[in-house]
Structures are given as C-alpha cells and as structure tokens.
Design a protein with these regions (language model features):
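Short cysteine/histidine-rich metal-coordination sites, predominantly Zn2+-binding motifs
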Residues: 21-26, 45-55, 61-67
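Short, ordered beta-strand-loop transition motifs
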Residues: 23-25, 40-42, 101-107
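Iron-sulfur cluster-binding cysteine motifs and their immediate structural context
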Residues: 1, 7-22, 31-50
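Auxiliary Fe-S-binding modules of radical SAM enzymes
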Residues: 30-40, 182-475
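Generic recognition of long tandem-repeat/solenoid scaffolds
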Residues: 27, 46, 109-113
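Short active-site-adjacent helix-start/loop capping segments
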Residues: 38, 54-56, 120-121
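Long, contiguous alpha-helical scaffold regions
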Residues: 81-244, 248
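Short Fe-S-cluster ligation motifs
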Residues: 33-36, 57-83
Length: 475
C-alpha cells in the first residue's frame, strides 16, 4: 500500500505518479520528516511502524541487552614497553627485536615489539569544518605529487585519505606519499592541494589546505575556527524554542541540509506555521532543503545572506516580518524585514536575533584536525611474534592478544587480517618513519599473557624481563 513517502514521485523521470487515495483509518506518522500516511495493516516507508486498528505501533519489541562483546583483560590492555625505538629484525622470520615480560596481578604478561614496515598504510585526516574542500574522490596532492583523495564526508567534518598500498607503489608519487603520511602522523604541518572543478565554469581549480594534528586547518589562506552545531535542520531542532522568541522566520544555511524554521516540524512543535518565505535551495522534506556545494556560506553556493531568500509568498507573509539568516556555526548573521512588495531589506541585527546567533555559537566546538593512521600488520611482521602466523591473527580477534601502536590502543577491523586504525594524538611523539620500498614504519606491540603466548607458538627462548632494560630502570 502507498504511504505517500514520495520516493516514486521523486525518481519518476516523467512526473506521472499521483498521490494515493486516502483510506479510512489512515494514520500520519511523525517519527521523521517524511510523515508517511499509513493505511490500516500497513507499515511506513521505514518498516518500523505498523498501523494496527488506527494506531501506529513500533513493530519490534524494545531490546534491552546487546550482543555479547569481547572484552580485553585489563592486565593486557597496556604494553609492557612500546615499540618506539625498538628497531626491526628483518627478514621477519627472526624473532621480534624485544619480547618482554612483566608480572601483573600475579600473572606473567608478554609484549612483543617491532617497528614494522607496512606497505598497506595511510592516514585518514579529519578536518572539523564546513568549508568546501572539493568533491569526494578528488585527487589530493603534496608538493605536486598525487598522494590521496577527498574521502567520504562525516557529520561536521571533511575527510581526506592520504596513502594506501596503491598510492605507495605508484610510479608517480609513491615516495612523496610515504613522506606525507609520516609527516601527518608525526604531527607535522603539511600543505595539501585538492584538484577539483569550479562549480560555475567547470574549469579545474586548486584548493590549498594546511593541516596539522591538533590544529585547526587553514583552507585557502583562511584559518578555520568553528565546527558546526549540526546541519541546518538539526540547528532548528535544537534551538526552535529560542528562535520562536526572537524572530518571525529563520533560515539556517548549510551545504548538506539548509533549514527553514517556520516550516520545520520543530517549528510546528513550538506553534509555528509556514511564513511564506522560500529558501534558495532544493526542497527535501518539510523545513529541510538541500544546499549546493560551493565556496560560499556554510560550504554552499550562497555568497551573501540575502542569497538565501529565494522569494516570499505575500499571500501568507506580511510586511514587517523579520527573517534571520544565519549558518550552522553562527559566524554569519543578518536580519531582514519583509517589504510590502515581497522583497526583503536588510536591517540592523536586533538583540533578540543576536540571541539566536549566539545560541548557535555557544553550542559549537572549535575546529580541529585529527590524523588517524591506518595500517595492516597481517603480513610477514607476524613472524617476529610467533611460529604460527595465523595464531596471532586469531588471538587478536579473540581478544587474547591486544594490539597497540606506539602505546595507543588501535581499533582492529572485523573480518580477516589485522587491519587497524589508531588516533595518532595518542601515540608516542614522532613514532613513525618510512623506508624507500616505499612503506611507512609503525611501532607495533602485541600484548598477551605468557600462557597465551606459548599457546600461539611464541618465541619463548627470546623472552626478557622488563627490569633488565636500562630504559625501564630510568623510568
């Protein structure tokens, strides 16, 4: 049965689909902005709610307990020593440079350490900004060499991936890629350039990004300061009560979803009805509009606050009505007054309108750059750990062995192999380097009980007591 979710209308190239006829007992759902009209016995588009006799019911019982999770024994959560400065025993058939034992809570704990060259490696760079940096898949350069690409965007953050096995082995840029990965992972300042296309002319253009772990990025010469509160729709959902007290209408500009306060369901929740103002964006659902990507406000094509107002329907609006235009960081704020002819005129910001902008600002985090090192240690480096390489892989996934990188806990991807990601801000300073194979070199530690180490075929004859290390004595 049709629930008027409008998917078919939106994808039909001929505009040939009409709305469904209303049936007795049909109930409108309010669990998202689609607002399906669900006939008796049917479910909404999301399949979560069923109309049972004129009442919408969640058709799955509340689940109290999640799946059992593998928990790491606290005794093996931290390595006995880090691999930083340990060196590498190559070829990997040799035992790791250091296999160290320490007694913890009466249990012998082993850590094997090596500085492992990893061909499968790179860094995921997270930039907390709304500023446009190019389209997903655009090539990223460093010193004129291709080193990565613009990655899938995350909520409030632009993402860049530098490296990967294919970039490292490429004829053009392999060495530059290795250097760039290491510089970023070690917290150094790096200038990247994204090659993209101008939205108006289609001609190639370059976007320069200066990034450094723990520092807000600089994009085309402008230092970023603020991470958005959320998308434009989320901003209204969070601050609708403040907006109602302060303005007649509010447009929150955002490249993902631009919000229109009076039409939004959060606006309706606080007593608003549509004001007649039409945003300059493509409508998605009530109060939610898709903004085009560009180098304007909030990463959109809109260059000025006035550009955000497409038109005003004067059969609904009235002269003197106030319209606040802002963005999701509160860095932009302009107040407009509707004129009798349907045009709008900018007027000085009122104290009330400023309250809305300040409320957005006060709920934003500062912009930052985060660098996460990604690597795969499921290759020959396992030989330095034990005689049975599959055994250490299985031990890691079973939680019997704990992988850390330069002392920092790593998230190991599910499935086969030992592929991981680690926050370099938590890793020992300047822990990474590279070799001209080319590959990056990462400090890899595996920690487990001595009993489990023996079970996986560990190099038992090479175990040393941590107290025998002069560095440990100084520590």
């Amino acid at each position: 049965m049709c629930v008027e979710c409008n998917v078919c209308r939106r994808v039909c190239p001929f505009g040939a689909i009409d709305g469904a006829e209303k049936t007795e007992g049909m109930v409108q759902c309010h669990s998202c902005s689609i607002q399906c009209k669900v006939p008796v016995g049917s479910t909404g588009a999301c399949k979560r709610y069923t109309n049972e006799g004129g009442r919408l019911v969640r058709n799955r019982a509340l689940v109290v307990e999640g799946k059992p999770q593998t928990e790491i024994d606290p005794r093996i959560a931290k390595p006995v020593i880090t691999a930083v400065g340990a060196g590498t025993n190559y070829p990997c058939i040799r035992p790791a440079p250091h296999i160290v034992c320490e007694k913890r809570d009466g249990v012998d704990v082993i850590t094997t350490v090596t500085e492992a060259p990893l061909s499968y490696s790179g860094v995921l760079v997270k930039l907390d900004t709304n500023t446009y940096i190019g389209e997903e898949g655009d090539t990223v350069y460093c010193e004129g060499k291709p080193v990565g690409l613009v990655h899938t965007e995350e909520y409030g953050s632009k993402m860049i991936y530098v490296g990967g096995a294919n970039r490292l082995t490429a004829k053009d840029g392999g060495f530059a890629t290795a250097r760039t990965i290491v510089a970023l992972a070690n917290g150094e300042k790096v200038e990247l350039t994204v090659k993209t296309a101008d939205h108006e002319t289609g001609k190639p253009k370059m976007i320069k990004i200066v990034c450094q772990q723990g520092v807000a990025p600089i994009i085309n010469g402008t230092q970023e300061t603020t991470m958005r509160i959320g998308c434009g729709s989320a901003t209204i959902g969070l601050l609708a009560d403040v907006m109602k007290e302060c303005v007649d209408e509010c447009i929150v500009i955002d490249h993902h979803v631009t919000g229109l306060f009076s039409e939004h369901l959060a606006g309706k929740e606080v007593g608003m009805t549509w004001s007649g103002v039409v945003p300059n964006a493509t409508k998605s659902t009530v109060g939610r509009y898709f903004g085009g990507h560009g180098d304007g406000i909030g990463g959109t094509v809109l260059q000025t606050p006035r550009d955000a107002i497409k038109s005003v329907d004067m059969s609904i609006a009235h002269a003197g009505m106030t319209v606040l235009v802002t963005n999701t960081t509160g860095e932009v704020g302009a107040l407009f007054e509707v004129q009798a002819d349907g045009d709008v005129k900018e007027i000085p910001m009122s104290e009330k309108a400023q309250r809305v902008v300040d409320a957005i600002k006060s709920n934003c985090q500062g912009s930052n750059t985060s660098v996460m090192y990604c690597g795969g240690t499921g290759g020959s480096a396992r030989g330095g750990v034990c005689h049975h390489p599959i055994a250490i892989t299985e031990a890691v996934h079973a939680g019997k062995a704990h992988l850390t990188i330069g002392g920092a806990p790593a998230y190991v991807y599910p499935g086969g192999g030992i592929n991981f990601i680690v926050d370099t801000a938590k890793v020992v300073n300047h822990a990474f380097t590279w070799v001209p194979t080319p590959a990056t070199v990462a400090p890899v530690e595996y920690t487990m009980t001595k009993e489990d180490y023996e079970k996986i075929g560990g190099h038992m004859n090479h175990i040393k007591n941590v107290e025998d290390f002069p560095e440990y004595q100084k520590h």
